[in-house]
Amino acid sequence: MKVLWAALLVTFLAGCQAKVEQAVETEPEPELHQQAEWQSGQRWELALGRFWDYLRWVQTLSEQVQEELLSSQVTQELTALMDETMKELKAYKSELEEQLTPVAEETRARLSKELQAAQARLGADMEDVRGRLAQYRGEVQAMLGQSTEELRARLASHLRKLRKRLLRDADDLQKRLAVYQAGAREGAERGVSAIRERLGPLVEQGRVRAATVGSLAGQPLQERAQAWGERLRARMEEMGSRTRDRLDEVKEQVAEVRAKLEEQAQQIRLQAEAFQARLKSWFEPLVEDMQRQWAGLVEKVQAAMGTSAAPVPSDNH
């Protein structure tokens, strides 16, 4: 009887443990606080949103996902999305560093160090996701047609853990970027603690976004792409307007230069005409006097020649 009760107790405890594990497996995952920003934020956030959407699709482990996992297509897609995210993040960080020039050197160095650490953690999380999927591919290929149900369950568990860590580190990176951006906007020499005190509204805004992320998570990718296209179109129109304004300024400058050159040319012509008139007034009397002297000399020569040409009277008549 004791043995029977012990067996029943073990069976009951095993059933409870299985229910607990099933509840843990089916527990919904928290969404990223700043996912709303991925839909309407910076370019690196949009790239991270695409990585997030693709990872969520992989996590479904549908038949199509399992087929593509056996090839290198999934890891190639993740690699491209990772590279795009880190590239856009690096460009955004460089842009903020240029704006942070007026801030004290010590503050800027501390902010940059914290931001680099958060950026490295996010990159490591994405690299772990890719590495785990590559490991799963190798394990499945090594099974040689055997059941891979246990491998899929283990992969799903790892992906949930990695996804939660990715959420946490991406949220931390966004907060640190907000600190960095606030320092660039502030442009004053103050410590990191003083800047963080001014970020209370941003933290509260993140909580509000976390409360509304459930409704935003279901927004179709097409709508987000259209919104991104509209922002890009608006930016292109703004750049075109600036270019036209710059061309108008250049045209005005060219017109001013042409007017100045024409004015200077007119002044040079007037000066040349005045100088020519002055020379004429100087030399004209001399020329007239030389002409009179020459005419008188010619008359004298002609008179002298006429006298010498007259006939001499003869003595024989």
UniProtKB/Swiss-Prot annotation:
Source taxon at top rank: Eukaryota
Region annotated 8 X 22 AA approximate tandem repeats, chain positions: 80-255
Chain spans, region Lipid-binding and lipoprotein association: 210-290
Sequence repeats (start-end): 80-101, 102-123, 124-145, 146-167, 168-189, 190-211, 212-233, 234-255
Modified sites of kind Phosphoserine: 147
Methionine sulfoxide sites (modified residues): 143
Residue ranges, annotated region (Specificity for association with VLDL): 278-290
Positions of heparin binding: 162-165, 229-236
UniProt PTM comment: APOE exists as multiple glycosylated and sialylated glycoforms within cells and in plasma. The extent of glycosylation and sialylation are tissue and context specific. Glycated in plasma VLDL.
GO terms under cellular component: chylomicron; extracellular exosome; extracellular matrix; extracellular space; extracellular vesicle; high-density lipoprotein particle; intermediate-density lipoprotein particle; low-density lipoprotein particle
InterPro entries: ApoA_E, Apolipoprotein_A1/A4/E
GO biological process, one term: very-low-density lipoprotein particle clearance
Pfam families: Apolipoprotein (PF01442)
UniProt keyword list: Chylomicron, Endosome, Extracellular matrix, Glycoprotein, HDL, Heparin-binding, Lipid transport, Lipid-binding, Oxidation, Phosphoprotein, Repeat, Secreted, Signal, Transport, VLDL
Cleavable signal peptide: 1-18
Region annotation (Homooligomerization) ranges: 266-317
Family affiliation: Belongs to the apolipoprotein A1/A4/E family.
Listed name of the protein: Apolipoprotein E
